[in-house]
């Protein structure tokens, strides 16, 4: 399986706001990312890469098992996302009809705050998504 992380890291750097680069050099090997359960009883896990998503600008990896689907939901902040691993689907609920878009690794989407949407991992194996937010 090809490693998309180097090219996706360049994409992430290209879309990050300028102030995010005022950091010291830091490294976080993939096997050291401190994943935590997002919600009790749910399988999705969050791995913080930089910042704190509950406080401000942040980059976070989301891991979900294969064939997982979220309920229709909304977030309190805008976010950008890049598919790292697996086949992802994202639905917009605008106009009362959902429009599903399938997103393979390397794909990108944005989501506005307070807009209802749905997400799913269509792969049989886990999906990994890079979530980037500027506000909590």
Give residue spans per PLM region:
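Bacterial N-terminal signal peptides that target proteins for export
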Residues: 1-9
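Bacterial N-terminal signal peptides
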Residues: 8-17
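A short, N-terminal "cap"/entry segment at the start of jelly-roll beta-barrel domains
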Residues: 20-58, 101
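Conserved hydrophobic/aromatic beta-strand scaffold that supports enzyme active sites
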Residues: 48, 59-63, 80, 100, ...
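Short acidic-glycine-tyrosine-enriched beta hairpin
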Residues: 54, 88, 95-114
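Conserved short histidine dyad/triad with adjacent acidic residue
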Residues: 58-75, 103, 112-113
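Glycine- and acidic-residue-biased ligand/ion/polar-headgroup-sensing regions
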Residues: 65-66, 75-95
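Ligand-binding loop in jelly-roll beta-barrel domains
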Residues: 113-136
């Amino acid at each position: 399986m090809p490693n998309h992380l180097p090219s996706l890291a360049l994409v992430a750097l290209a879309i990050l706001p300028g102030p995010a680069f005022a950091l010291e050099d830091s490294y976080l090997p993939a096997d050291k990312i401190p994943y935590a359960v997002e919600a009790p009883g749910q399988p999705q896990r969050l791995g913080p890469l930089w910042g704190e998503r509950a406080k401000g600008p942040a980059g976070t990896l989301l891991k979900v098992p294969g064939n997982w689907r979220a309920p229709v939901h909304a977030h309190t902040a805008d976010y950008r996302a890049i598919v790292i691993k697996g086949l992802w689907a994202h639905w917009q609920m605008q106009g009362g009809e959902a429009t599903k878009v399938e997103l393979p690794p390397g794909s990108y989407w944005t989501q506005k705050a307070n807009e209802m949407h749905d997400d799913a991992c269509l792969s049989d194996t886990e999906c990994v998504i890079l979530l980037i937010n500027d506000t909590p």
